Amino acid sequence: GASALAIKPPKGSAFGCPTPPMMPKLHQACLVVGPRGAGKTTAVVNLVERLPFDRIFVISPSMKSNKELMDRLKIDLQDVFEDPDDIGALDAVKVAIDAERDDLERHLAEMRRYKWLMKEINSDKPHYRLDAGDLSDFWSSRAGNFMEPKHKWGGRRPCCALIIDDAMGSQLYSKPRRLNQFTIYH
């Protein structure tokens, strides 16, 4: 019957970042179009400010000169690419996002090791069988105890944004295949 054809969505959320009510759900690709002076950048900054982004990348020839917007969004200068004709900027953003992923995977692996070590220490098994490397990796002489591994985003997947501004007519849009691929796959 009809129940055999029922669609079963995958478990978990399709949205990687928790989004406040009354805000567009993340992840998304958002295009803001308007004539010069229409307030496009201001609108994007106000939207991005209200969303839970941990790291914001920018490709724009004018963003570094707009200190107020940079400060409001807490954008790190290393995440700003000023030349929209440099197609390598997309590669640099991808490398940075991949590094965030790798850091999270490293942290999750460390947490598994840490939890296993704590379970072993608190068990009735002889402690001399524990690996010295595991013991030293998590021991803090300052705290005088074993310390849980730390992650800059608290062990969760970071929410990242890419803002491309003042790039009309640049190589970024002239060779859109790279930008399209980046947008679709990330």
Regions found by a protein language model. Give the residues of each.
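Acidic/proline-rich low-complexity IDRs
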Residues: 4-6, 68, 76, 89, ...
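Glycine-rich, phosphate-binding/catalytic loops in enzymes
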Residues: 74-76, 180-181
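N-terminal pre-Walker A segment at the start of P-loop NTPase domains
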Residues: 1-19, 63, 73, 85
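Short acidic-hydrophobic, aromatic-tinged amphipathic segments that line or gate anion-handling sites
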Residues: 76-94
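Short, surface-exposed linear patches
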Residues: 53-54, 78-82, 185-186
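Conserved P-loop NTPase motor cores
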Residues: 16-18, 28-50, 61-65, 87, ...
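AAA+/P-loop NTPase substrate/partner-engagement loops
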Residues: 52-75, 88
